A protein has these predicted regions:
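Catalytic-core region of carbohydrate-active enzymes that cleave or remodel glycosidic bonds
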Residues: 248-268, 283-331
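Low-complexity, Ser/Thr/Pro/Gly-enriched N-terminal "stalk/linker" regions
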Residues: 1-51, 55-91, 130-134, 144-148, ...
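Beta-strand-rich binding/interaction modules
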Residues: 434-452
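Well-ordered alpha-helical scaffold segments within catalytic/enzyme domains
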Residues: 2-3, 50-65, 106-124, 174, ...
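Solvent-exposed loop and edge beta-strand segments that line ligand/cofactor-binding
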Residues: 33-50, 88-107, 148-184, 221-250, ...
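C-terminal beta-rich recognition modules with glycine/proline-rich loops and embedded aromatic residues
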Residues: 313-328, 332-419, 469-549
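A surface-exposed beta-strand-loop module
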Residues: 448-479
Length: 549
């Protein structure tokens, strides 16, 4: 079973509209070639540039729109690198700066994605491959041996951080960040570079040294006391995505087991009532869409590798109530308050903290929204299809999402009212061999409540009705209290209120009117995922009650 490739997916409908808004935002002035290399990045060299390159590359593929400035940004990158081929300072005496490593991890991710996107252009792809090799060789390999010394004692990690982290002090050879644990974000960028270099670069010595560094990082990542030192959840989850990429390469069961362990820790100790995140473990001060997107991607990837229903359910809930609820009217992504957190004021309310984290989260939205389209359908292998009564060319519907998909050589269009309503249409657009295509619908507690089923067709369309049921649930996580949350299917419904909490509505008194639900006295409950349709002023002023005692 595998996710579809990016070039097999074309977003349509609302997810395409959201992606287009973000695309326009990321082609604005501060993300253009004349500006991007000179903006203030608060000590994160390579971060702004890398996240932007990654976002534009992913959005180009998911929307089918050619990016206006992406190629020029990549072409001009070398003008802003030092003589060793990476950005900003060259440290001496074996010193390492964890924010420099973290920022360059995003630069590696962006360049790896761009290489694959432009791999049929030999001039561009070879230049980028050379840049990837230089960054690995001249920056990251200098960190070999240092991860054993990474400061992980509570008394060493006492920095207070803001929504953009900063370098605090030096301990040993490490310049440490208020974003505790960000030295492990490179598990993501370096694992991507390792897989790419193994396939496309004939440099065995470099890849062996890189593998040794990755092994060192993984070994010490296993030892981090995440709660004791309040590790940043974005750093934690990004590192776990890198660890999972390595698992996909070497199939080491210890890696998969550890990712599942840490993801459970995150759900229990680092997740808000609306499936967003605490920026750090143990510090429910604000959310960060970077981490929310990480958690969505991890949930879907863990479902792919384990097929455990829990991960499918979390994929839905994080997507609709965490990722999509964090997008802003301008297409970017911003931070919110931590709903449900024990001991915090107004824990029942979802409210804006920072309207837009334009320096990081808006760019992370590019891979996030592209992954929403890509992860919706899972293509089964021939062997997996044979194990299920021989249904041919099976594609599993993890969640229905508007788009045009190429699966098993068949071009398929999906039209979905879900999750607002239950009607989903699957239409075959092109099927050159007239082969049967099989749709598999897994059982979902508040989606497809029927038994799992297979539907095969060669042409025409299949219409599926998915249950979208009103119900109450207790907030997930160990720190979100016992309050009740109102759901329609997997979407959280909220009520715009002042600071004063309202009473829980009578479920029998709620009726759906279009995209909202109302009580007989006119009280409105709307999906929090639709916040991006509001005005910027409303986003910053409104408080939305989502928890009821």
């Amino acid at each position: 079973m595998r996710f579809l490739s990016y070039d097999s997916v074309l977003a349509r409908g609302e997810i395409a509209a959201r992606a287009s808004l973000l695309y326009a935002r990321l082609e604005g002035t501060m993300y253009r070639p004349d500006t991007i290399f000179t903006v203030e990045t608060a000590g994160w060299p390579g971060d702004w540039e890398g996240r932007t390159i990654l976002a534009l590359t992913m959005l180009a593929q998911s929307t089918g729109k050619e990016p206006a400035y992406l190629d020029e940004i990549v072409e001009r990158l070398g003008d802003y690198c030092n003589e060793k081929g990476y950005m900003r300072q060259i440290l001496s005496d074996g010193d390492v700066d964890e924010q420099q490593l973290s920022g360059h991890s995003w630069l590696l991710r962006g360049l790896c994605a761009y290489f694959l996107f432009r791999r049929n252009d030999p001039v561009r792809s070879e230049t980028v491959l050379g840049r990837i090799r230089e960054i690995v060789q001249n920056l990251f390999l200098n960190a070999a041996g240092r991860y054993a010394e990474y400061p992980i004692l509570p008394e060493e990690r006492v920095e207070d951080g803001k929504e953009s982290g900063h370098i605090g002090r030096k301990i040993g050879h490490w310049y440490i960040s208020s974003d505790t644990g960000c030295a492990y974000i490179p598990l993501d960028g370096l694992s991507h570079a390792y897989v790419l270099l193994k396939e496309y670069a004939a440099d065995r010595e470099l890849t062996e040294k890189l593998k040794a560094l990755l092994d060192e990082m993984v070994m010490h990542f296993y030892t981090i006391p995440f709660l004791d030192i309040k590790v940043q959840t974005h750093a934690t989850l990004t590192a776990c995505r890198g660890l999972l990429r390595l698992y996909e390469y070497d199939r080491d069961p210890k890696k998969l087991a550890f990712v599942q362990k840490i993801f459970k820790l995150y759900v229990d100790e680092g997740m808000t009532a609306n499936y967003a995140n605490y920026n750090w473990f143990g510090r429910p001060e604000w959310t960060e869409p970077c981490a929310i997107i990480d958690s969505f991607m991890l949930a879907a990837q863990l479902y792919l590798h384990t097929h455990k229903p829990l991960y499918a359910e979390l994929t839905h809930k994080i997507l609709y109530n965490g990722v999509l609820a964090s997008q802003r009217p301008n297409g970017g992504f911003g931070t919110d308050t931590c709903t449900g957190a024990d001991g915090t004021a107004a824990a029942e309310f979802l409210a804006c903290s920072c309207y837009e984290a334009y320096w990081c989260c808006s760019m992370r939205g590019g891979e996030g929204l592209a992954s929403v389209s890509r992860y919706s359908l899972l293509e089964w292998s021939a062997e997996e299809s044979r194990r299920t009564d021989g249904y041919p060319n099976t594609v599993e519907v993890l969640y229905p999402m508007d788009g045009i998909y190429t699966v098993h050589g068949v071009k398929l269009m999906v039209r979905a009212d879900y999750p607002m309503e239950g009607k989903v249409t699957f239409r075959i657009l092109e099927n050159p061999g007239n082969k049967p295509l099989t749709l598999y619908f897994p059982k979902m507690q508040y989606g497809n409540k029927q038994e799992p089923c297979f539907v095969s067709f060669c042409s025409g369309e299949v219409v599926r009705d998915v249950d979208v049921e009103l119900h109450l649930e207790t907030a997930a996580g160990k720190n979100n209290g016992s309050g009740k949350i109102l759901y329609a299917g997997y979407q959280i419904l909220g009520h715009i209120a002042d600071d004063k909490s309202t009473d829980l509505p009578d479920m029998n008194d709620l009726q759906q009117y279009g995209k909202v639900w109302k009580t007989s006295d006119g009280t409105v409950f709307a999906p929090i995922s639709a916040r991006y349709l509001d005005t910027p002023e409303a986003i910053q002023q409104k408080k939305i009650q989502i928890l009821w005692k």
